[in-house]
C-alpha cells in the first residue's frame, strides 16, 4: 500500500500576498500545486509567521519580526494541509501572545500542529497520525535562535540531539514510521 506524504517548506504571508490571504484566494495563491497538496494522503507545511489578533508585540531580535493572521491559517487549511510545523526561527517573533494566538487559532479550526507549544513540554510533544492504517510519529525541531520554548514560556521545540534521540526512541514504541522535520540553515540560502 502506497502512502503519499507531502512536506512543504516555509509559508509566510508577506507584502503582495497578504491581501490574497486576507481575501482567502487559495486557488490563486497555490495554483498548480494545490492538486498535489489535496491528492496527498497527508500534507504538512511550515507556518513560519505567528498570528497576531490585536496588535503587534514584536520581540527584540536580529532580523525581521514576522506575523500573519487567522485568515492565513484558514487558507492553509482550505488548501488541504493536514498539519503545520511550528519549530522555526520566527515562531516567537510576536512574543508569548503570538505563540498563544497561533496555537489557539490552529485548535479552533482543527488544524494539527507539531513543534510548538505554550512551554517546552508542549513544544516537544510528538504528533501521532493514523494514515491509511499506519501510525506516523512527527517530530519537529529548529535551531536555537530567538524562538525556543522554555519551561515558563512558549515557543519552538529546540534542536537538541539528546532530546531528539530520546523522542525518536519514544516515537518508535507507538509508531510504524517516524518523521523528523528539522528547520535549520542560513537565511536566504536554499
Where are these regions (language model features)?
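Surface-exposed amphipathic alpha-helices with a cationic face
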Residues: 34-38, 43, 77, 103, ...
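Active-site-adjacent helix-turn-beta-strand microarchitecture at beta-sheet edges
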Residues: 83-138
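Binuclear metal-dependent hydrolase catalytic cores centered on His/Asp/Glu-rich metal-binding motifs
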Residues: 18-31, 66, 130-180, 186-189
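Active-site-proximal segments of metal-dependent phosphoesterases and phosphodiesterases across multiple
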Residues: 55-77, 177-190
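Divalent metal-coordination and catalytic microenvironments
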Residues: 10, 45, 86, 90, ...
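Active-site environment of divalent metal-dependent phosphoester hydrolases
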Residues: 13-16, 51-54, 89-103, 120-125, ...
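N-terminal active-site segment of His-dependent metallophosphoesterases
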Residues: 1-66, 166-170
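Hydrophobic structural segments
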Residues: 6-7, 12-13, 66-74, 112-114, ...
